Amino acid sequence: MLCMFAVLLLSVFSVVAPVHGLVVEQFRAPACERCAGHRGVTIATSTDDVVCAAVAGEIVFVGQVAGVAYVVERISADVRITYGQIQPLDSLTVGQQVDEGQPLGLAQSRVYIGVRVGTRPVHPLRYLGLAGARLVSSSRLLGVTRTRSR
C-alpha cells in the first residue's frame, strides 16, 4: 500500500535523469535489512558532469559517510533519494528546497543513485520511471544508458 501511494505521488511529479551515463552496477535487493546487496544503481559518468535533483524535494543530508560524499533528498514523508559519489555544491544546505533538475553537485567517475520507501530500498530507475519497456529507447532521451542483461 505504501509503495502504491509513493508511485501515485511520483506520477504527479515531473522526473529528470539526475546524471548522464552508463549503468555499471544494477540494483540488487538485499534478502534482509543487513544482508549483502546493492541498494541502488551505479552510473559511470564523466568527472565534473552536473548531478541534478530527479524530483523536487528537501535536502535532508549533505556530507560524507565512510569517506564517500552523499546528498539525500526527501521527496515525500517516506521517500528519499540518495545521490552518492558526488562533490556537493558549496551552496547546498540541509533544509533547502530544490526543484526537479536543479544542480546538486558534480559527478566523480561514478555516481550512486538509491531510493528508499520508508526503510526499504527499491530499484531507483524503475521507481522513478527512468527504466522499463518503451517503443523508443528512453535511455537516449533521458540520458541514462542501461547495460544489456546477460
Can you say where each PLM-predicted feature lies in the sequence?
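Surface-exposed, glycine-biased beta-strand/turn segments
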Residues: 3-70, 99-100, 122-126, 130-150
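Short acidic/polar mixed-charge low-complexity motifs
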Residues: 49, 77-80, 120
